[in-house]
Amino acid sequence: MSQNNLNGAQVVIECLKREGVDIIFGYPGGSAIPMFDALLDSTIKMVLSRHEQGATHMADGYARETGKVGVALVTSGPGATNTFTGIYTAMMDSIPLVVLTAQTTTPNLGKDAFQECDTSGMTFATVKHSYLVKDPNELPRVMKEAFHIARTGRPGPVLIDLPKDVTAGICTAPFTEEMNLPGYKIPGTAPDEMVEKAAALINKAKRPLLLVGHGAMISDACRQVREFAEKLNAPVTSTLLGLGVFPSNHDLSLGMLGMHGTVYANKAV
């Protein structure tokens, strides 16, 4: 798609396509009209929810099942605030999510305009990062950064607040692969000396036990966990989100830990 004469909403939709998005979940409203208009000419499928909270949970569930970034699209004010439970669920469970919230026009920000709220500010503690876009030319970079942040490191939700004049305005900036994230550091692998130290401590352990969590699931380490447990002959217990990493019918399985877990798993730990 050519960059010529595209408005902000069309740029957002094109960026979604470039990130491999083929389905989004949402509920329309006045400030989001440019976004929904842009979807009419797109191959991206729109799944209409009956409530914005439902749209966010649907995007969350889609991300859990497919491993892709889930995308939700809602309108301003109550549409945005209705997403907060779904956003925080994704944050706590490390689910990659991009939530697009419409907003009043930029000249009306901070003036108690109709359905205006500080969406990016209110979600600051419940997302990996939040954006308030005030210039259509920022959209290509912001979209690229948002998906990168959502899916890398410990996955999680990113919110992009889109004023109506930004999605309706013309964007002249090119689509880009460049990002400006000087403070965003993705943890690397552990140094060899740290791995060797951990291995030495494990070898000295008299009663080793493995506690398996969600990280093993999202890193696709199920086979390695099983091989490690069998080599150590160590019992394995799991967090709620780690269920499924280790076979529950295995002789070394103690089941889930915690208040809803098994007695013997809790006593073993």
What is each stretch, according to the model?
Residues S2-V269:
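N-terminal alpha/beta PP-like core and its mobile active-site loop of ThDP/TPP-dependent enzymes
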